[in-house]
Design a protein with these regions (language model features):
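Loop-to-transmembrane boundary segments
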Residues: 1-15, 84-102, 165, 357-382, ...
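N-proximal low-complexity "stem/linker" segments adjacent to membrane-targeting elements
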Residues: 2-99, 103-107
């Protein structure tokens, strides 16, 4: 594709988003009947999404309970006695994370059901962090003997690179590639996990992963994804942040049921063969996970699958030094995630390049899922919250028609039905959330239910606004810088 078409494909999604979110305003005068039906269809779509979230979260939770009850190590010993030939490389990209947070992450890895001697730790730091090597040496001294090996990489940012997780892990991958050649490890039995520095991986994750890896003959065209739940510090963060991450956590659980159209994110695993064939990560992207999935998809001519691991991965909710810095950090994190809209252009350009070798239905399924996510990110709140009120308010002629009169009533009915599935979200969150700390008073528990009353506000501040921000920046050609979300161990200055 030429530069013109690449740029056009970049701005197309933001343009469509702005057209849709402003439609209730301008279309109320130009196409009043059409905009009414558009809003009702959109509300029905939201009801479908709410129902899917509620039902799939319950189904997934039941599967998580089943998975946690299985002794996967015993199953390995019975079904695959030579399971020790599988080694798991774990990248932990870090930049200014507190020592205690990294210790927690490594402790969870050391206490896996699968023997820790099957794990190779790669602590991937940035040269920009002055104390990284000192911190890394302390961690290696404490944990080195527990694992198969403990490697440290120190990434020096180059001029043509974008600071962030992607460029860091590409550097680490090239270092590890040389390491594997020296150690003469069998690459056919290696997996690579990208683990966010704050993520505590469930103790059964790698034993379950090993079983699934050995069981599946298509292991080299496959990613594995667990359920990311933001519960490490959920009792400590401000209420608006807690609401956002509660919804994200339940969504992470529910999405396990949609592996055929889902994407990898945050903490995920693939075979080393798959990563090497793909060329690992790119060094000039911010949102690396969906981008990597599409890159691997085209590198394998569309023969790529995602398999869910029905186990939780415990992450930190966004937290700052104080209340307001926490809210700002949450906004910046969501804006960074919304910047993944750039993946739409990347996917289109790669499809044009590889279209002769790619199954169109296979590509369309993934592409529509990505387009739905990013196209509607800035739009959802406006249509759902204000959409039904605006056309009759702006167009007096529409107001006195039957269609205009019933629009707010029908829309309200559909959205009321949607709130029924909020019960599912509250229930699954309650079942998965860690026990209440002693320093959290019981009356605080009431807020865990009342907090959902703030959804219209939090949805705008942490959903619509960062989405509009990211889309507008892309539309105007203003690139986004990677801002690392701060991590805390509960001790703040």
């Amino acid at each position: 594709m030429s530069k013109f078409w690449i740029r056009f494909s970049e701005i197309l999604t933001p343009i469509l988003s702005w057209i849709l979110l402003t439609a209730p305003f301008w279309a109320s005068f130009v196409f009043p009947t059409i905009v009414v039906y558009f809003i009702l269809v959109f509300d029905a779509y939201f009801l479908y999404k709410a129902a899917s979230l509620g039902i799939n979260s319950i189904r997934s939770y039941l599967k998580i309970r089943q998975t946690t009850k299985v002794n996967w190590l015993e199953k390995l010993k019975t079904d695959y006695p030579d399971y020790n030939k599988v080694k798991h490389i774990i990248f932990i990209p870090t930049y200014k994370e507190p020592l205690s947070v990294l210790e927690r992450t490594l402790t969870f890895l050391a206490e896996q059901e699968l023997p820790a001697k099957n794990l190779i730790i790669v602590l991937a730091g940035e040269d920009r962090e002055k104390d990284f090597l000192l911190k890394a040496d302390l961690l290696k001294a404490k944990f080195n003997k527990l694992f198969f090996d403990f490697l440290i990489t120190n990434h020096v940012l180059k001029k043509d690179e974008v600071a962030g997780k992607s460029s860091n892990q590409l550097f680490a991958a090239n270092v590890v590639k040389d390491y594997l050649e020296q150690k003469k490890l069998d690459k056919a039995f290696l997996t690579l996990t990208s683990c966010d520095a704050d993520v505590s991986i469930h103790p059964k994750y790698f034993s379950n992963l090993t079983y699934l890896f050995l069981k599946n003959p298509n292991r080299y065209q496959r990613f594995w994804q667990g359920a990311l739940v933001f519960y490490n510090n959920i009792w400590r963060v401000p209420l608006p942040v807690r609401v956002v991450h509660t919804i994200y956590s339940v969504m992470g659980v529910a999405e396990l049921m949609r592996a055929s159209s889902n994407f990898i994110y945050s903490t995920y695993t693939g075979s080393w063969v798959l990563f090497e064939k793909t060329g690992f990560w790119d060094n000039d992207v911010i949102s690396e996970d969906w981008h990597l999935f599409f890159k691997a998809f085209f590198a394998n001519e569309g023969s790529l699958e995602l398999e869910s691991i029905f186990l939780p991965l415990y992450a930190d909710a966004t937290e700052g030094q104080n209340y307001w810095s926490s809210l700002l950090a949450q906004y910046q994190q969501n804006r960074r995630w919304a910047w993944g809209v750039t993946d739409i252009s990347y996917a289109l350009s790669q499809f044009v390049k590889h279209r002769k070798n790619i199954s169109i239905p296979n590509f369309v399924l993934r592409f529509i899922r990505a387009l739905e996510q990013h196209l509607l990110w800035p739009v959802n709140w406006w249509i759902i919250t204000l959409g039904a009120s605006i056309p009759p308010l702006l167009n007096s002629e529409l107001r006195y028609t039957t269609l205009g009169f019933y629009l707010p009533k029908l829309s309200g009915l559909i959205l009321t039905l949607s709130t029924f599935f909020l019960i599912c979200i509250i229930s699954i969150d309650w079942l998965l959330r860690p026990p209440r700390p002693e320093n959290v008073k019981k009356p605080f528990l009431i807020l865990t239910i009342l907090q959902y009353l703030t959804l219209p506000i939090t949805g705008f501040i942490f959903g619509a606004l960062p989405g509009m921000d990211a889309h507008t920046r892309l539309l105007l050609g203003k690139r986004l810088e990677y801002k690392v979300t701060e991590k805390f161990d509960g001790k703040k200055n």
